[in-house]
Curated annotation (Swiss-Prot):
Name of the protein in question: Putative DNA repair glycosylase MJ1434
CDD domains: ENDO3c (cd00056)
Keyword entries, A-Z: 4Fe-4S, Iron, Iron-sulfur, Metal-binding
Presence of keyword Nucleotide-binding: no
One annotated GO molecular function: catalytic activity, acting on DNA
Record annotation: effect of changing residue 132 to K: Shows AP lyase activity
GO biological process: base-excision repair
Protein family membership: Belongs to the Nth/MutY family.
Cofactor binding: number and manner: Binds 1 [4Fe-4S] cluster.
Pfam families listed in its UniProt record: HhH-GPD
Cofactor: [4Fe-4S] cluster
Sites where the protein binds [4Fe-4S] cluster: 202, 208, 211, 217
Domain of life: Archaea
């Protein structure tokens, strides 16, 4: 099609929003719960994360200082449903320690006037926090305009011909941020819509027949 491939990005957002409606992602009662979820969701499904978070809620532990002070073995058992619980317990302690020592809590961190790129660099300096996790925390916990790229994003937009399937994380992130309005809610919704679309249609084995954006797709 003659349309610039990057111009598709915003058009596809509007089509997906019309098709699926608002996703209202991230489901959390507090900013810190988003941080916890961003760590726990690494390499697992959200259903498993929900089970782990519910365990923490049952023990009244979803606060920064409480997570810092809880025995690590107890924490491991509580987050076991999310998998890789030994690793994630350490990562959860690491990111929480950083927040408490530098900001007091996540609410205060969200109020800082530091530039988003500085905050991102701080998060990436924490052991166990990669780019997707850092951007998830920035976007959904701290309300910063930092687009989240995940495996679904790469799969879907390489099939659409917008990105090369070997494109690096920051390259993909930059393409989205340059071709979308700089709008917090659009960033939040679009990431969630991509996830939903890849679960419904753009699976590993794609279901193209009734896909709402198949007119744009090179793989159909």
């Amino acid at each position: 099609m003659k349309e610039n491939k990057f111009e598709m990005i915003y058009k596809i957002y509007k089509i997906l929003l019309d098709y699926y409606g608002h996703q209202n992602w991230w489901p959390a009662e507090t900013r810190y719960e988003v941080v916890v979820g961003a760590i726990l969701t690494q390499n697992t499904s959200w259903k498993n994360v929900e089970r782990a978070i519910n365990n923490l809620k049952m023990e009244d532990l979803l606060e920064e200082v409480k997570i810092l002070n809880v025995d690590e073995d107890k924490l491991k058992e509580l987050i076991r449903p999310a998998g890789f619980y030994n690793l994630k317990a350490k990562r959860l302690k690491n990111v929480t320690k950083f927040i408490v020592e530098n900001y007091g809590n996540t609410e205060e961190m969200a109020k800082t006037d530091k530039d988003t790129l500085i905050l991102r660099a701080e998060l990436l300096s924490i052991n166990g926090v990669g780019k997707e996790t850092a951007d998830s925390i920035l976007l959904y916990a701290l309300d910063r305009e930092s687009f989240v790229v995940d495996a679904y994003t790469k799969r879907m937009f390489s099939r659409l011909g917008v990105i090369n399937e070997k494109a690096k994380y920051d390259e993909i992130k930059e393409i989205f941020e340059k071709n979308l309005p700089k709008d917090l809610e659009i960033y939040k919704e679009y990431h969630a819509l991509i996830v939903e679309h890849c679960k419904k249609f753009c699976r590993k084995k794609a279901l193209c027949d009734n896909c709402p954006i198949k007119e744009f797709c090179l793989s159909k």
